[in-house]
């Protein structure tokens, strides 16, 4: 039997991650290319790099049955249209049509956090569970909600925008979405750095963070791991707000798995345990009892694996027609 591969693509602000993945969710080859931040040549770049990689591997193009791609922002999955991606200047952008035209391969488009959630459900910390919440903590905060094995899209593609749940109703920091006080302004890497700088400026206690040039969220968690008081205050504050948001979500959705992903989640147990403490306090007891909170297992591969999952499902639908 001929090999069957799917192309999983995760469009990020800095890089486009790509992988050829078989029908069992096993990565055969993976690589990345820089993102054109104007958004103008992204599909051309993807088409060229897929062709180039297939040539390098001496594989025929027909081995790739379908492409599954994740893009930032709300997506009309049926039409394959990205409603808006601010960083790339896209508005009502027909990504599916452009991608299929350039590659000659059928494609399906989904929100980037949603494909990460599907990847973790299929092959990662979701462990095959059908009711999963993934929150991605990176430069921003994204989210994917899976209910009964299906991504929650909502009426116009805005389902799962966990990063824009209001955490501070009055006096919160401004968010890229135009509101203030979103959890993204607190639990993202940029939010953590902002909070740390505010605490350092007002601190009477000594802290190693004062001497850190180009302060990062990683610096904050490393200092907290060494019991730096200011760093611990920052982590406690972040975990408290994130635990509250996740507790409210769990009370509404009753998931079996809550997965923390993205670069900030590399803080590991230090972050997870503190988030869980507030979560258990805030969630409806029966919902809290049912939910396991864990760190994402797939790292940067979650998106491409989730992309392959939706690609495989679309391909199977057409096989059964």
Curated annotation (Swiss-Prot):
It is found in: Cytoplasm. Disruption phenotype: Loss of glucokinase activity, no growth phenotype on glucose, fructose, maltose, sucrose or trehalose-containing minimal media. This is Glucokinase. ATP binds at residues 8-14. It catalyses: D-glucose + ATP = D-glucose 6-phosphate + ADP + H(+). The keyword Kinase applies. Optimum temperature is 32 degrees Celsius. Enzyme is stable up to 40 degrees Celsius. It is an enzyme of class 2 (transferase). An ATP-dependent kinase that phosphorylates glucose to make glucose-6-phosphate, not active on fructose, galactose or mannose. Restores glucose kinase activity in E.coli glk mutants. Belongs to the ROK (NagC/XylR) family. SUPFAM superfamilies: Actin-like ATPase domain (SSF53067). Its main location: cytoplasm. GO terms for biological process: glycolytic process. GO terms for cellular component: cytoplasm. Its EC number is 2.7.1.2. Induction: Constitutively expressed, activity is maximal at the end of vegetative growth and declines during stationary phase when grown in rich broth (LB) (at protein level). Expressed in a similar fashion in minimal medium containing glucose, fructose, trehalose, maltose or sucrose. One of its GO terms (molecular function) is ATP binding. It holds the Pfam family ROK. Keywords: ATP-binding, Cytoplasm, Glycolysis, Kinase, Nucleotide-binding, Transferase.
